[in-house]
């Protein structure tokens, strides 16, 4: 719709979708760039699935569903139907791409890796995965699987699927313990990155609110002269966590 909208209305629509970062100087160019990135990743995912043995109908559907973090499958038992480690790996990559801010993806394609490493929201995303995967691995080993490799494989896939709010599965969710399902639900609630196709609260919002909370605590208990203004890095540069910015993050 941004390709046909213009002026203030286009900017309002763009902001309402959660895309705070422009990839190009104007919104129409930004929309075209986002569309090209999306089409490119979808085509690459479809080709990868096809090479790994999926028929082209399944390949296209799963590539679109993984990248859009929609999680729709042509099979009743989702990705478990294929029982393929390589297909699961491709799906994980597509889900990770889908849950990442489009502006960050643009920086990634430009090779600006040092800039990307500054983004605290990505560090939080990695921390959540590093924390949840061992928990699910241990629980899966205790309940379902007989060896560590299979349990780890399932834990990695389910963690990424839940945190990206995709919903693909390689296990029967009804066989999981209540604590495992609770962890997966929490991951879904946290959700993916702002400006991505993922749902949930968004881990980028969680990161900003956490930093704002820490800053508020420091201001209350430490001398004002030693408390520096809190900030976060976004694709457009350093953003200071002002009261207005935190309020906007909290509302949308």
Feature names for model-found ranges:
Residues 1-252:
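Membrane-proximal intracellular helices of multi-pass ion channels
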